[in-house]
Amino acid sequence: MKKIFFLLIYFYFALSQSIYNHPELEWRTFETEHFIFHFHDETENTAREAATVAEYIYKPITDLYDYEPPEKTTIIIKDTDDYANGAAYSFDNKIEIWALPLAMDLRGAHRWIQNVITHEFVHIIQIQASIKYSINVPGGFLQFIGYEDEKREDVLYGYPDQIISYPFPGIIIPPWLAEGTAQYMYDGANFDFLDSHRDMIIRDRILNDNLLTFSEMNSFGKRGIGNESIYNQGFSFVKWLTSIYGSDINRAISNEISKPFQFSISKALKNITGFDGNELYEQWSSYLKKDYSEKIGHLKDEVSGEIIEDTGDVNIYPTWSPNGKSYAFLSNRENDYFSQTNLYICQVNNKNAKKIAERVESKPSWINNNHLVYSRRSKINKNGSVFFDIYKYNLNLQEETRLTVNGRYTSPLVLKGKDQIIAFKTIDGSTNIYISDVNFIDFQRITEIDNGTVLFSATYDMNNNLLYIDGNDLHGRQLYTLDMETYDLNKISNPGWDTRNPNFHKNSLCYSVDKSGIFNIICEKDEKKSYAIIHSVKCINPHESAKKDNVRELERLPTFESRQSIWENYANKNGIPWRWDIIEYESVPLSVKSEVVVQSDTGAPNDPVPVE
């Protein structure tokens, strides 16, 4: 029995290691002047772009902090899960990047590899430049242990009854500083910026006197959009500091907190600027209050309606059933974090939302009044990966059916009148569109995208047999059309603005755009392009529309607190006119334009070779 027990333990740990290491993948390695890249065959395009970007940003970042790593930095590129993130391990001088681009509803869209490589390498350099002792010594402590008096002669020491420990951290970088500098990057960098979403969250907190305090910015562990607010406020605070003291203050802070006996970021700031952390925070927050008061002073009264879903911190992607008696939406009610969304169905006549599926993150689509399809993360597979799959739910039977296995499909859309379904799949950082019969699932690819363009959601114009899609290839989401006869994909929106969440209904194309600096819902009716513009006042920020006849379901961030709700506005019933003037949100820049960092003709500096 004991042998079986130990055999089971050995098998468990052996299985865990094999899952973690993904032995099914063929890994390769190449080196550039300052980096070592590891990638598997399925991520070659991402690795090549990452190599170009990394060498491009190496000198500006190391010059800013006057610091270079002691050896080449290792960058690992992987696409083993439907998960998007980057991680910097400063003491290991290593970066991990997932090839899947991050798609967060409360952040603007930026070219993923340019953004994440620069962001994580700033973490590497800033943290290493701020270490007090050595890259091999993350910290230490002094400890005293007291013992009871010995009771017997044959006992050398009594039982320990006292312990005193005093830690000496090797690094003291608070979250706002780490994330603020990583988003600031360096002078002239435009791979990330304070876009309309970040501006919206800070504006909401300022106008409702809910800005995180200096102390609250020093720690994560917050629910809702609290952690995201640390990113936003840190970014804004660092930008303000550099505007007052120059970008060299980033290096000065690292130099100051690297001193062996400097354990306070507030005192470090005082030694550099003459003001402690709280004093600088008050100056920055006063600047924001004045700035936002001036920006919104000319805005007219808001167009608003009755809130119909506000439980939880986020309620998004409302989608009407064909008969208009129910709607589906995603919500994080009963959960703590923004990304923990589940799928709910609500009948209009009773208003009681019922959860039907967990771990759903993209917009669902109705097949008919009793069936809908959606994408959600499936359970871990035999290789240790977690992928998105398409599922169908029968409302009559209250039964879920899995339609794909390890499919990696998101944002399914049923094409009205065609008995077909399309979905997106993102591999190696690029999204392609797949189509299948809705009754016999067998997805076939209909686009050939390999340039890092990412697609998010779609809507169907049955009359013209067109898909309207929002996607990203540089900065901000853009609108595309896909001809369902020729499969030609064309960008149709202004690249200077972020245009997203299209919805086509009865010859009207509605979408959200930040042309004024605040997102507004715009509707183009027929080809005459008459506009219904719902302008946003103060913190209100509509993102998406789901039209039902003359009813518009919108998502917004309400003025009274930082959470997203679904609200409805009866245009004809309340006598609200079909046309509003665009209200410019002054002093807010449009999306920053930049040239894509183009890889060399030969790709990576060295040809990839298998890992020995």
Regions found by a protein language model. Give the residues of each.
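A short beta-strand motif characteristic of beta-propeller blades
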Residues: 304-309, 351-357, 398-404, 442-448, ...
